[in-house]
């Protein structure tokens, strides 16, 4: 409790009369998140993933890709980093071919399989968790290239849930369930977008994380 009160928030969520439904600024939420992440030593963004993400992993991933020239290079290098990290556990990753340019001017960006993200018994019930993981990664890609990453469609392995509208609002495009892969379908030229950031701007981004990964942009109605 002392850890939370030391953040000097505009409200005290631990007070007896606190209204837990009160909206707070995303930057205050980010402060709370960073403190909880430090206490738990887990950077999984509170998504309920099957495995803990050790503190510092996201920073190392960012440093690993920040000097890539294009988004495609960054996506491929990020997959290498994720695969390497998973070899340190007892669960080898099936995340082997992240980017595929198709013959019709589009491309697929594949995410890890459902069983790499959540427990085998939770695959269909965790469709929201998987979708939010993908949405956060999309926002990170948008930060890397400095502009929106427009999607043609999103593919999810999980069966269709009852709340289809939530997923369409989250991504702003068609969402297909029961697919072979968890993937983004996007225009091929998006892969050639240059990365615009440096290690200096990355450090500022990390100081404010996860703010830019959770809060919608002005023209985006897909807040998590």
Q: How would you label these PLM feature ranges?
A:
Residues 37, 79, 134-138, 142, ...:
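Generic solvent-exposed, charged/amphipathic alpha-helical segments
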Residues 59-65, 116-123, 192, 211:
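Short hinge/gating elements
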Residues 103, 148, 177-180:
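A short, structural micro-pattern
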Residues 107-162:
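Conserved helix-adjacent loop modules within structured domains
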Residues 161-162, 166-224:
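Extended mid-to-C-terminal alpha-helical interaction segments
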């Amino acid at each position: 409790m002392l850890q939370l009160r030391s953040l000097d928030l505009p409200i005290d969520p631990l007070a007896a009369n606190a209204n837990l439904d009160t909206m707070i600024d995303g930057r205050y939420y980010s402060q709370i998140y960073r403190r909880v992440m430090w206490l738990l030593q887990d950077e999984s963004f509170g998504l309920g993933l099957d495995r803990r993400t050790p503190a510092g992993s996201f920073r190392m991933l960012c440093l690993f890709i920040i000097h890539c020239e294009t988004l495609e290079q960054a996506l491929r290098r990020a997959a290498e980093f994720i695969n390497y990290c998973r070899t340190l556990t007892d669960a080898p990753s099936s995340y082997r071919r992240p980017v595929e340019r198709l013959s019709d001017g589009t491309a697929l960006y594949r995410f890890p399989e459902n069983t790499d993200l959540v427990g085998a018994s939770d695959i269909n019930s965790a469709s929201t968790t998987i979708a939010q993981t993908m949405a956060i990664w999309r926002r990170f890609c948008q930060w890397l290239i400095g502009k929106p990453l427009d999607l043609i469609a999103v593919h999810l392995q999980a069966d269709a849930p009852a709340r289809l509208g939530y997923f369409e609002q989250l991504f702003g495009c068609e969402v297909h369930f029961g697919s072979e892969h968890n993937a983004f379908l996007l225009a091929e030229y998006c892969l050639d977008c240059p990365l615009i950031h440096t290690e200096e701007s990355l450090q500022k981004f990390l100081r404010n994380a996860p703010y830019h990964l959770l809060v919608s942009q002005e023209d985006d109605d897909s807040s998590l």
